[in-house]
From Swiss-Prot:
Protein name in the entry: Ribosomal RNA small subunit methyltransferase A
UniProt-listed Pfam families: RrnaAD
GO MF annotation list: 16S rRNA (adenine(1518)-N(6)/adenine(1519)-N(6))-dimethyltransferase activity; RNA binding
Family the entry assigns: Belongs to the class I-like SAM-binding methyltransferase superfamily. rRNA adenine N(6)-methyltransferase family. RsmA subfamily.
Name of the gene this protein is made from: rsmA
Keywords for the protein's UniProt record, in alphabetical order: Cytoplasm, Methyltransferase, RNA-binding, rRNA processing, S-adenosyl-L-methionine, Transferase
Catalyzed chemical reaction(s): adenosine(1518)/adenosine(1519) in 16S rRNA + 4 S-adenosyl-L-methionine = N(6)-dimethyladenosine(1518)/N(6)-dimethyladenosine(1519) in 16S rRNA + 4 S-adenosyl-L-homocysteine + 4 H(+)
Chain positions recorded as S-adenosyl-L-methionine binding sites: N28, L30, G55, E77, D103, N122
Length: 279
């Protein structure tokens, strides 16, 4: 009998520990272990990796990651109600699961992990985008992680893989595709979750590139892209006027028409503009 078979069904775990998903924490529990195993497999061979999981809840994906052979899992959970359920998993997989009760935005996972590291998570909806941007914009590259396998609302997932000219194209697409290969690998309907959210979800897999696609300073690129898309319907000469007094000249030097809008500009041109603004 494998370790996962010694654990009670997740619905029993939720009932015995009186767990209910809290909207304030962005929680939706995924209880189908066939689905959590499928998500874990999207992260690839984990046998020689430490895996970081954010917001494990009662531990559905945690079980999947361990059953699929993760060398070790570090799970960061803000909701103390979930800790007893996670402790049961830790007992079944002795030495392979460490649980930290805290806020993922405030904890340095590297103090608890050994490379190589991958990240796999059904991210809490209220912090998922902020965490992704952090993981994509460290000053030094390559990052501490090899790959990200992350569940988002379908709309957010589509923004990560969007192309220029589309309504979904924006800051997330540019930052993700600058430093990673990004693709949607799974879709999940609302009824897969407890409680069912109002929208569908999708799993995005991002693999870190050895080098960014085009040279640019991460902080400058992130700032410029944020400014451009905060006013995406404005011409860039207006949206970016706070970035430099001679912004029209900088745009032209980067090969961008000042009258273009952000959604029309490809990644390579934004990187060229970031380099111009760094001079």
């Amino acid at each position: 009998m494998s370790a996962i078979d010694t654990l009670p069904p997740l619905r029993e775990v939720i009932a015995s520990h009186q767990l209910s998903a809290r909207k304030s924490l962005g929680q939706n529990f995924l209880l189908d272990l066939n689905l959590t195993a499928k998500i874990a497999r999207q992260a690839g061979d984990l046998s020689e990796c430490d895996v970081l999981e954010i917001g494990p809840g009662p531990g559905g994906l945690t079980r999947g990651l361990l059953a699929e052979g993760a060398r070790r899992v570090l799970a960061i959970e803000k909701d103390a109600r979930c800790l007893p359920a996670l402790a049961e998993i830790a007992a079944a997989y002795s030495g392979r699961l460490e649980v930290i009760n805290g806020d993922a935005l405030e904890i340095d996972p590297l103090a608890h992990m050994t490379p190589p590291i991958r990240i796999a998570a059904n991210l809490p909806y209220n912090v998922g985008t902020e965490l992704l941007v952090r993981w994509l914009t460290p000053r030094d590259w390559p990052p501490f992680w090899q790959s990200l396998t992350l569940m988002f609302q379908r709309e957010v997932a589509e923004r990560i893989v969007a192309k220029p000219g589309s309504k979904a194209y924006g800051r997330l697409a540019l930052l993700a595709q600058w430093r990673a290969e990004a693709r949607i690998v799974m879709s999940l309907p609302p009824e897969a979750f407890t409680p069912p959210p109002k929208v569908s979800s999708a799993v995005v897999h991002l693999t870190a590139l050895p080098e960014p696609r085009f040279p640019a300073d991460a902080a400058i690129l992130s700032r410029v892209v944020a400014a451009a898309f905060n006013q995406r319907r404005k011409m860039l000469r207006a949206a970016l006027k706070g970035q430099a007094p001679d912004i029209e000249d900088r745009l032209l030097a980067a090969g961008i028409k000042p009258t273009e809008r952000a959604e029309q500009v490809p990644l390579e041109a934004f990187c060229a503009l970031a380099r111009e603004l760094a001079r």
